[in-house]
Each structure stands twice: as structure tokens, then as C-alpha cells.
């Protein structure tokens, strides 16, 4: 997709910002060393490094880290936060500066986990470097909480997971007083991410196996992640401490432009004054990724622009949905006809919400760091 084509697609596009992951560099080194892009990238990394240094009271040089392609770890979690947010700001700035494509010309934007803070900042509600102070101030405690936590994907072959039952079973496991488990992300109708301390995931699996007829699968991740978006964050009073910092954070008033779909609520719920409330709830509330993905389908989004280094969860979600829809509709004349029909705006209001799923194979995904390098300017 060339620059002119991407610009024309903006009215029906959504920008998707990635969150923290075990890998956070992507192609940032290439962008930093690029003869034209380099100055903007260096400026963003330098400013983010100064903010990070100020918050954690330790010298941080993100420019050197990226130039040397030195990966972050859980022990440098604060630097990972600053790096990801800086590169997201840099990528959006490059798109504007060199191609005249503005984020505000898109229909909407959203972000997974840390990405929601970047999205809200990019939409003009907060300054990016001021907003990153909040997660940076909590980074040490988040990393410490990760030491005894395990991330796992829970999925089964039925039509949809019984979310209410899962929430209740988590509470019952927590009631035993031997650790906390909770939903971190609603990935799809039949899968969620869970975060659990100690052996809570095993005990949860044992309980749910006796409560549902369908076979439930639990796949653990060997990597360590901070237990964001779960009640585990209560243990170090992280939500309230973050909220206290936000009292005096500059800006935060006015509607985001474009509208931001919040993974806290699953919809475009930001108004002129509730950005701080959303950021507070963001810390310990599950990420409603599936609800937001489905919302983009209902909004007739045709292009997803993925922002940040090496985005993974959001692109994978759309790709998996596309593959599933194509598998279900393959060979069906009726389904192929409906897929063609939903391309016509006049008939969309006449169709049920579920028909929006048929749009999944039509969505084009653009990984911004790849696109910037493929459409490189001298």
C-alpha cells in the first residue's frame, strides 16, 4: 500500500497501539539509524529517557539502547515502558511529517494495555511524556509482582466462554488465601488471558473442569509479565497510588480526536473529563480486546494501522478472526454473497450485528514500522 492509498483509506481506518511485551525493539534501530527518520526518532527516545531517568532516579539512555539494539528485560521494565511509548509517538510523528497522514484523520484509535495510554496521548488528551510518568512510577512494583505470577491462555471448543462463571471461580480460588488469580484480557469469545500467583492457575483449572461439560484448555506462558489489569495489582496499592499522581497531571480535558475505543469499557467512552478515571480503571480491570475488535467491525473499519515496535497481539487477533471467518464461509454461496453485501453502507443498518463478523476478511492490516521503511524517503 503506497502513501496515497493509505491516506485515502484514513476515513475508514483505525490506529492500534501495542502494549508491553517480552520483545520491545522491533525495527526501532533501523528507524533510528535512518538518514531521514533518525532525528525525530532520536528526539522522542531522548525525551522519554529523560522522563524515565527523572521518575526512577537512575540514568537511562534509550537512544544508546536502541542504537545498540539492546533488548529490555523484566529487570528494565521501566525502560521498556518509556521505549515503547517513545517509539509509538515517533512512528505517528514520522507518518505526519514525511507523508502528511495525520492520526486525527482516522475514524478511531485504540491500544492494548500500555498502548491505550499512548492512544489517548496521540489523540491529544495528554502529553505523551507526561502520561508515561504514571506507569513509570508504578513500574518497580509491577515488575516485583511479576516474579510470582504466571500468564496463561484459557480456551475451549464451545461457542463462548462462560465469563461470569470464570469470574466467580477466580473469586472462590482467591478466597482460600493462597494467592490471587484473575482475568487479564478477554481475547475472543472462547479465550481469555489469566494471571495467577503461585499455584492458583492449577487450582482454578481443577475447579473449572468440574463445572463445565466442554473440555477446557489452559496453556501457560514461561515468560514473566507484570499482572496488569487484574486484582493482583491491589496488593501494592498500585491503582490508588497511580490515581493520586494523576490528580496533578497536566491536561486531560477535551474529547480525544479521533475517538478512542477503550479496552476498559469496550467502547468509545472517553468524554471531556474522564480520561483520569479510565486510566485508573485501566490498571486493575480486564482488557476487553474482543469487544473493541468487534466494535471496529461494526464501525466498518477497513484498515488497521498497527503502531509500535513489533506489534503482535492485535494483529494476531484480527488474522485469527479472518482465518476463522474464511474457514466457516468457504464454499458457502450464501455467506460469500453476504460478504459482498456488507461492503455497501446503505444496507449495513439492515443487517444484524453478527453480520459484522463477515467484514473480518476484508480488513487490511498495516504494520507502521514496516510501512515506514518500505516507503522510505531519502
Give residue ranges: language-model regions:
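Helix-rich "cap/lid" substructures immediately adjacent to catalytic or cofactor-binding pockets
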Residues: 2-110, 194
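Short Gly/Thr/Asp-enriched flexible loops that form oxyanion-binding sites at enzyme active sites
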Residues: 312-324
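Short, solvent-exposed amphipathic alpha-helical segments in soluble enzyme
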Residues: 32-33, 209-211, 320-323
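Charged, glycine/proline-rich intrinsically disordered loops and linkers
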Residues: 40, 49, 56-68, 158-176, ...
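Alpha/beta catalytic cores of group-transfer enzymes, especially the acyltransferase/condensing modules
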Residues: 20, 123-273
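Acyltransferase
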Residues: 215-303, 311-312, 343-373
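Gly/Ala-rich beta-loop-alpha elbow adjacent to hydrolase catalytic centers
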Residues: 107-115, 119, 123
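Conserved small-residue
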Residues: 17-19, 48, 88, 115, ...
Amino acid at each position: 500500500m503506497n502513501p496515497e492509498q493509505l491516506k485515502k483509506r484514513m476515513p475508514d481506518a483505525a490506529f492500534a497501539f501495542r502494549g508491553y511485551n517480552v520483545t520491545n525493539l522491533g525495527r526501532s534501530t533501523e528507524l533510528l539509524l535512518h538518514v531521514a527518520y533518525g532525528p525525530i526518532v532520536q528526539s522522542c527516545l531522548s525525551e522519554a529517557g529523560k522522563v524515565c531517568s527523572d521518575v526512577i532516579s537512575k540514568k537511562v539512555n534509550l537512544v544508546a539502547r536502541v542504537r545498540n539494539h539492546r533488548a529490555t528485560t523484566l529487570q528494565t521494565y521501566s525502560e521498556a515502558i518509556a521505549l515503547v511509548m517513545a517509539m509509538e509517538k515517533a512512528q505517528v510523528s514520522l507518518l505526519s511529517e514525511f507523508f502528511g497522514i495525520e492520526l486525527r484523520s482516522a475514524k478511531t484509535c485504540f491500544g492494548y494495555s500500555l498502548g491505550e495510554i499512548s492512544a489517548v496521548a496521540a489523540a491529544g488528551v495528554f502529553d505523551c511524556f507526561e502520561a508515561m510518568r504514571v506507569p513509570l512510577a508504578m513500574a518497580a512494583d509491577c515488575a516485583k509482582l511479576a516474579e510470582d505470577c504466571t500468564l496463561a491462555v484459557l480456551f475451549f471448543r464451545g461457542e463462548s466462554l462462560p465469563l461470569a462463571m470464570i469470574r466467580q471461580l477466580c473469586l472462590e480460588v482467591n478466597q482460600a488465601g493462597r494467592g490471587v488469580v484473575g482475568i487479564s484480557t478477554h481475547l475472543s469469545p472462547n479465550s481469555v488471558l489469566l494471571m495467577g500467583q503461585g499455584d492458583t492457575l492449577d487450582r482454578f483449572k481443577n475447579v473449572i473442569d468440574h463445572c463445565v461439560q466442554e473440555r477446557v484448555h489452559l496453556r501457560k506462558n514461561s515468560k514473566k509479565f507484570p499482572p496488569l489489569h487484574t486484582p493482583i495489582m491491589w496488593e501494592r496499592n498500585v491503582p490508588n497510588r497511580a490515581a493520586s499522581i494523576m490528580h496533578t497531571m497536566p491536561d486531560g480535558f477535551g474529547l480525544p480526536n479521533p475517538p478512542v475505543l477503550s479496552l476498559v469499557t469496550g467502547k468509545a467512552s472517553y468524554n471531556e473529563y474522564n480520561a483520569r478515571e479510565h486510566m485508573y480503571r485501566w490498571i486493575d480491570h480486564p482488557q476487553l480486546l474482543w469487544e473493541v475488535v468487534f466494535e471496529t467491525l461494526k464501525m466498518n473499519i477497513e484498515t488497521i494501522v498497527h503502531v509500535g515496535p513489533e506489534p503482535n497481539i492485535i494483529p494476531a487477533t484480527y488474522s485469527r478472526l479472518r482465518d476463522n471467518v474464511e474457514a466457516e464461509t468457504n464454499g458457502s454461496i450464501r455467506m460469500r454473497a453476504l460478504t459482498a453485501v456488507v461492503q455497501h453502507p446503505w444496507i449495513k443498518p439492515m443487517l444484524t450485528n453478527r453480520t459484522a463478523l463477515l467484514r473480518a476478511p476484508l480488513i487490511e492490516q498495516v504494520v507502521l514500522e514496516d510501512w515506514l521503511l518500505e516507503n522510505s524517503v531519502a
